[in-house]
């Protein structure tokens, strides 16, 4: 079973990825893990990726695609995999098709976890952290007993810059703009399966299982 998992930040992709790889016994292949492994193993492509990252530059597609090609050719990916964080563009998606074709296979499905932007905003902007002990709270899902104070030590709760409304909204807008052409690409190929990510976590996975039952 060869899958790509998509979803905006806060959609619950990580949770579903864990359940998919456990149930179907396939490797979870994320872009970050691939880069780290290539750099740790000191491969030629790993060295190239490191030089770009050390300079604060984006790793170009030819390097990223090469690292993906090397990873998907490994033995543990022969019977299936879950790709997470790749492809990010239509160009990368087209190259993924070429890579899989060269390996004598193709994608089975692209699963997109859909969550309304307003719901994502609530999920992502609700996090507060204790300045003293670092305990994390959420305004909706795990609120403190007294607003603005830690239950454990009464420490002041603060919000990281990354969790502030303006930052989160900007991140979501950028992601939505990037993702739309990719969703259209896979929809035209008949590979796209969208799931309601606003349900309970277990119900989301039930929907995933229904899709994967046909493969």
UniProtKB/Swiss-Prot annotation:
Residues 30-59 are annotated as: NMP. It is found in: Cytoplasm. ATP binds at residues 10-15, 127, 136-137, 199. InterPro entries: Adenyl_kin_sub, Adenylat/UMP-CMP_kin, Adenylat_kinase_CS, Adenylate_kinase_lid-dom, P-loop_NTPase. Keywords: ATP-binding, Cytoplasm, Kinase, Metal-binding, Nucleotide biosynthesis, Nucleotide-binding, Transferase, Zinc. Pathway: Purine metabolism; AMP biosynthesis via salvage pathway; AMP from ADP: step 1/1. The keyword Membrane does not apply. Its EC number is 2.7.4.3. AMP binds at residues 31, 36, 57-59, 85-88, 92, 160, 171. It catalyses: AMP + ATP = 2 ADP. GO terms for biological process: AMP salvage. Residues 126-163 are annotated as: LID. PROSITE patterns: ADENYLATE_KINASE. It comes from the Bacteria. One of its GO terms (cellular component) is cytoplasm. Zn(2+) binds at residues 130, 133, 150, 153. It holds the Pfam family ADK_lid. One of its GO terms (molecular function) is adenylate kinase activity. Consists of three domains, a large central CORE domain and two small peripheral domains, NMPbind and LID, which undergo movements during catalysis. The LID domain closes over the site of phosphoryl transfer upon ATP binding. Assembling and dissambling the active center during each catalytic cycle provides an effective means to prevent ATP hydrolysis. Some bacteria have evolved a zinc-coordinating structure that stabilizes the LID domain. NCBIfam families: adk, PRK00279.1-2, PRK00279.1-3, PRK14527.1. Catalyzes the reversible transfer of the terminal phosphate group between ATP and AMP. Plays an important role in cellular energy homeostasis and in adenine nucleotide metabolism. Belongs to the adenylate kinase family. Monomer. This is Adenylate kinase. It comes from Listeria welshimeri serovar 6b (strain ATCC 35897 / DSM 20650 / CCUG 15529 / CIP 8149 / NCTC 11857 / SLCC 5334 / V8). The gene is adk.
